[in-house]
Structure formats: C-alpha cells, structure tokens
Amino acid sequence: MVQLKTAALALLFAGQAISSPVDIDSRQASVSIDAKFKAHGKKYLGTIGDQYTLTKNSKNPAIIKADFGQLTPENSMKWDATEPNRGQFSFSGSDYLVNFAQSNGKLIRGHTLVWHSQLPGWVSSITDKNTLISVLKNHITTVMTRYKGKIYAWDVLNEIFNEDGSLRNSVFYNVIGEDYVRIAFETARSVDPNAKLYINDYNLDSAGYSKVNGMVSHVKKWLAAGIPIDGIGSQTHLGAGAGANVAGALNALAGAGTTEIAITELDIAGASSTDYVNVVKACLNQSKCVGITVWGVADPDSWRSSSSPLLFDSNYNPKAAYNAIANAL
C-alpha cells in the first residue's frame, strides 16, 4: 500500500481548497467520502463515468476508485447508444462501464431505460400503439437482461413530468397514454426482480413546488394501483444557494410512499461548501435517502462546466466543498 504523507493528509481533509497538485495514487490510501458516507448507514456516494472519461487520463479513474462507491453511465445506457436501430443493440460502451464498476467493487445505477431525449428517430416516429408497446417492452427486456444481477437500481423512467406536475407529451405518452408507466415498470420488474426501480426527474428541489407535488401525487396513485416503483430519483442540478431547500424537498418526496429515494445527478453552480454540505446532510437526515450520485468528477467533464459545479477542479484537485463534505461526515 502506498504510504500517504502527513502533509498530504492535512491538505486532503483541511477545510480549505487544495491549490497544489495531489498524488492521486497516494489518495487511494485515504478514507473516501463514500466510506465516510456509508459509515452513517447509507448505501453509496457515487459519480458518473463512461469509457471516454474513464480512459482519457489516469486521474479520473483513480479518483473514482479512491473516493466514490457507485457509478452511473453518463450516456452509454441511453436508448440512442444501446438501440440506435430497431432490434440492433450495441453494448460496447455500457459493457465497459459495467466491467470497470464491477472490477472495482462499485455499485451501478442503470440510466436510463425510457426517456424522451436522446431517443432515436425511429422510436419517436412510431404512431401505432401496439408497435410502440412492443418496442418499449423489447428495449427494456433486452437491456436489463444483459445486466441482470449487476445493477443496483434502474432509472426506468426519466423526466416524464412538466414543470406544472403534469405528464410530458412524449411519444410514449402521446401514443400509449399514461399506461406506458405501468407497462415500463412491470416489464422491468419481470426482468430483474431484485433491481430497485426508479422514476427520475429534475427540478424536484423545493418542497411545495408544483413539479414535486405532481411527482408525489402521481407516484402515490401508481403505487396504489400496484405499479412496482421502488424509488424516486431527484437529479438535483442546483443553482448557487439552493442547497438549503433540498432537505424539505427530500422529505416531501419521501412522502410519496416508495421504499427509497436518491439524489441521482448532483451538481451545484459554484460548488460552495455550504451548498454541498447542506445536500449531503439532507440525505443523511432522511431515512429513505439511500445515496447520492455526483454528476461528474472534475469540472472540465461537466455538462455545465462553465459553472464549475463539481467537487474536483480542472487539475483534478479536490475543492473546498470536497473537504467540507469529508469534515462533515
């Protein structure tokens, strides 16, 4: 085991941002924020990856191995990646992610089976109900079967709500109707009964917001109808200062009646220590919140990189927010 120098330890867990380079390999001998988070009874504190970000340099995978306990594929399990043409599946990218995660002892969240975006044109152009139902079932069955027993949780449905809490007019809703929700979850349950099945969305960050209310009321209705929804995922893409609202939002989502909830795509504009600690504590204090996934490792790889929203800077050094989380756990 690589010995971690006392100076490096002091830098890593100090409450200030680290400005000098850190030996990434040495950091693997330290206690990870995932390990500290799990010591409080949670399942994981994770991040995202795909073949490109896992192979572009040595620092990104080293940080994932050292500090995070779970991986979500950023793009490689989305419909346009896995079934670009009807019945023709491609799993090279998702296989790489799953193999990396398993070989390094990381939990995996499958993301995502049904989403209106990054959807191939051949799917969005379907107008026949029975055809779309068949396509939907086949896609879910094929993707989930390949990874059966390897995925902790699946985002079965992603971003199906409008901001007013009503259901989005996607091809699935427009052609099949609301029943596509039941079809998707029942199909997923039949394929892998042991995987946790989630409905995932963004802007679920303030209690009382119409989208939160819509999610809660719909999930309550669907659960009462026997639809097998295990969890609600709150993406939690936040603006600066919004971390304080997350605790109330999680409590509201927990009231929907699922067995668990999770923060699934966390990033925060400006990455302030206060915001990040507020979010981590919100999950710690809500018994149904099983884990947090940060939507990226270092700022250059973020989908909103100009906002510097992640825990590591452009040199892959941990920021003040990382150290604040470590100190808070």
UniProtKB/Swiss-Prot annotation:
SMART domains on file: Glyco_10
BP GO annotations: xylan catabolic process
Localization terms from the record: Secreted
Pfam families given in the database record: Glyco_hydro_10
Gene Ontology molecular function, alphabetical: endo-1,4-beta-xylanase activity
Keyword tRNA-binding recorded: no
Residues of the GH10 domain: 48-328
Temperature dependency: Optimum temperature is 60 degrees Celsius.
Activity's dependence on pH: Optimum pH is 7.0.
Organism: Talaromyces purpureogenus
Xref: Gene3D superfamilies: Glycosidases (3.20.20.80)
Signal peptide: 1-19
UniProt superkingdom: Eukaryota
Glycosites: N285
Protein name (Swiss-Prot/TrEMBL): Endo-1,4-beta-xylanase A
Catalytic reaction list: Endohydrolysis of (1->4)-beta-D-xylosidic linkages in xylans
Residues forming the catalytic site: E159, E265
PROSITE patterns for this protein: GH10_1, GH10_2
Predominant place of localization: secreted
Transmembrane annotation, as ranges: none
InterPro entries documented for this protein: GH10, GH10_AS, GH10_dom, Glycoside_hydrolase_SF
Disulfide bonds, paired cysteine numbers: C283-C289
Family membership: Belongs to the glycosyl hydrolase 10 (cellulase F) family.
